[in-house]
Amino acid sequence: MQLLLDLHPDQYPLEGFRQRQLLEWVFVQGVGTFEAMTNLPAQARADLASRFRLNPFREIETVRSADGSVKYLFTLQDGRQMEAVYMPYLDRKTICVSTMVGCPAKCAFCATGAMGFGRNLTPGEIVGQVLAVAGGEGLAPRELRNLVFMGMGEPLLNYENTMQAARILLHPQALGMSKRRVTLSTVGLPKGIRRLAAEDDLGIKLAISLHAPDEATRQRIIPTGHRNSIAEIMAAAREYQAVTGRRVTFEYSMLRGINDHLWQAEELADLLRGLVSHVNLIPMNPWDGSGFESSTEEQIQAFYDVLAARGVDVSVRRSRGKDAGAACGQLALKRPAAAVGASA
């Protein structure tokens, strides 16, 4: 049976105002069954229920953090598992969604990378995370105004499904998100970055997980990094900016004694010269078996100071949800074996 959420809103069944009613039930009201769509004719509801399913998930569990963040563990219909994170702030509500079960990038400091790759998520399994989190938090779906593709997986390796999900998220009759509030994070795939730049109708923001300015360190941190050199990644980032006019964000996880040397801050500043960019320095979040430690606060500040003195727009991003295993780099800590197990 087809998952209704996989469809673009323009492809939804029914016609005219009945289609608009259906879209409102799904994306505005956030109902989970066709039977609850009481202003649709009974026959239409029965027909929909015979052709489509609304729920991508078999089970949903939550782990709540003291800071208000919530990790959602989703069991998909095939038994695989993946996670999303809800992060409430005073001025906004943000959701971090996954695009894959596991991840093939294998970043050494990231728990998701240690899982390996399970499979790509469908558009509906991506969008469904937003609807499920909204429901779990007692929110209307459109109250989640900020979204980052920064959960499990490499979005640019699940390109078509991620782009379809983004178009659903932005569609005015679906979730109606602002493109300025949606960010896609990639480990740095030049072909995918250039392809994203050509998506004229999207306009979502780009973040690149760089983590080192030199090849030797980056390949130690990201074992698959040898496939694309830093020079190739930076060239693609510059092309992206030339085409879109948008700022590029660079994510930099601070690993003690690995990528936090001041000479590396100097090299990073050199790499970014002439590019309108922002650098997020992220203290590494611990997980069992990682083999890495976060840089000290003093070293992070010193690294920051070098970048700032060189004119780099830089900030230190304090991760939320550490105590719930929901912070950056911690996703997949709960039952990773089940998450990447064989399909039922």
UniProtKB/Swiss-Prot annotation:
S-adenosyl-L-methionine binds at G153, E154, S185, S209, L210, H211, N285. The keyword rRNA processing applies. It holds the Pfam family RlmN_N. It comes from the Bacteria. Disulfide bonds join C96-C328. [4Fe-4S] cluster binds at C103, C107, C110. Binds 1 [4Fe-4S] cluster. The cluster is coordinated with 3 cysteines and an exchangeable S-adenosyl-L-methionine. Its main location: cytoplasm. One of its GO terms (biological process) is rRNA base methylation. Its EC number is 2.1.1.192. It is found in: Cytoplasm. Residues 89-323 form the Radical SAM core domain. The active site is at E83 (proton acceptor), C328 (s-methylcysteine intermediate). Its cofactor is [4Fe-4S] cluster. SUPFAM superfamilies: Radical SAM enzymes (SSF102114). GO terms for cellular component: cytoplasm. GO terms for molecular function: 4 iron, 4 sulfur cluster binding; metal ion binding; rRNA (adenine(2503)-C2-)-methyltransferase activity; rRNA binding; tRNA (adenine(37)-C2)-methyltransferase activity; tRNA binding. It catalyses: adenosine(2503) in 23S rRNA + 2 reduced [2Fe-2S]-[ferredoxin] + 2 S-adenosyl-L-methionine = 2-methyladenosine(2503) in 23S rRNA + 5'-deoxyadenosine + L-methionine + 2 oxidized [2Fe-2S]-[ferredoxin] + S-adenosyl-L-homocysteine; adenosine(37) in tRNA + 2 reduced [2Fe-2S]-[ferredoxin] + 2 S-adenosyl-L-methionine = 2-methyladenosine(37) in tRNA + 5'-deoxyadenosine + L-methionine + 2 oxidized [2Fe-2S]-[ferredoxin] + S-adenosyl-L-homocysteine. Keywords: 4Fe-4S, Cytoplasm, Disulfide bond, Iron, Iron-sulfur, Metal-binding, Methyltransferase, rRNA processing, S-adenosyl-L-methionine, Transferase, tRNA processing. Reaction proceeds by a ping-pong mechanism involving intermediate methylation of a conserved cysteine residue. Specifically methylates position 2 of adenine 2503 in 23S rRNA and position 2 of adenine 37 in tRNAs. Belongs to the radical SAM superfamily. RlmN family. NCBIfam families: rRNA_mod_RlmN. This is Probable dual-specificity RNA methyltransferase RlmN. It comes from Deinococcus geothermalis (strain DSM 11300 / CIP 105573 / AG-3a).
